[in-house]
């Protein structure tokens, strides 16, 4: 039996999902005053990163992060609700109070931790996908010199690609022709259409596309960095970190990470944020 059968099934955007939060005797662990919507945990996600978060053929949200978000909501006695939105709008939307939690695999940075409470729960690195057969023989980052490379706008991946570009230029090579897209799905569509010669995404997504036979993964394991959940409310972040530590103790967190081939966090979870 997989962890998916043990935890809540994924749901639809802007649709509250039936959950144990509605059962008698389940008292919400977070006050309504700390939430965008009473009794509800509203989460933003960009479901263009299979198998971590994606939309299946029935239009339903699926993936590791959706399963995790649903389980967190369940243990908080709240109803999970998702807002599908591009990553570039997520931090401004959180600060504006449009959702309670960013659940899209946001990379932790010191700059972001100064803006909002964050809980590191996963480690991720970056891959470079290319056309089948790797016709350009890309085997090292310098091979991207002078080539059009697609990436999602506004994320950690774009930042690291631009840092890589500076490193390449400093070596006297031609700059990478960086092309930004609203999300990873459109970036991969551009690679498929020949508009770019490579696409940058997190390791599991590039591996999934390779497994499907769509693209090859030329490079992987670049810039390993913690991935986090991000919240606006300090009380909510404290409640969420308590849930994650409970999941650590009962083994459900480790089971979920291992199901997706991810390395689980071995230590206790903690909140990193302004004044924390």
State where each predicted segment sits.
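N-terminal hydrophobic or amphipathic helices and topogenic motifs
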Residues: 3, 9-11, 21-70, 74-79, ...
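Ligand-binding clefts/hinges and TM-proximal coupling segments of bilobed small-molecule sensing domains
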Residues: 22-26, 30-31, 156-176, 218, ...
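Alpha-to-beta junction loops
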Residues: 42, 78-79, 96-104, 147-148, ...
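Bilobed "Venus flytrap"/periplasmic-binding protein-like clamshell domains
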Residues: 42-50, 61-74, 106, 127-182, ...
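Periplasmic-binding protein-like
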Residues: 47, 123-130, 204-245, 262-276
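Extended ligand-binding regions for polar small-molecule ligands
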Residues: 66-75, 134-135, 142-143, 147-155, ...
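Acidic, polar ligand-binding/catalytic clefts
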Residues: 70, 74, 79-143
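A ligand-binding cleft/hinge motif common to bilobed small-molecule-binding domains
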Residues: 88-92, 105-114, 160-167, 190-223
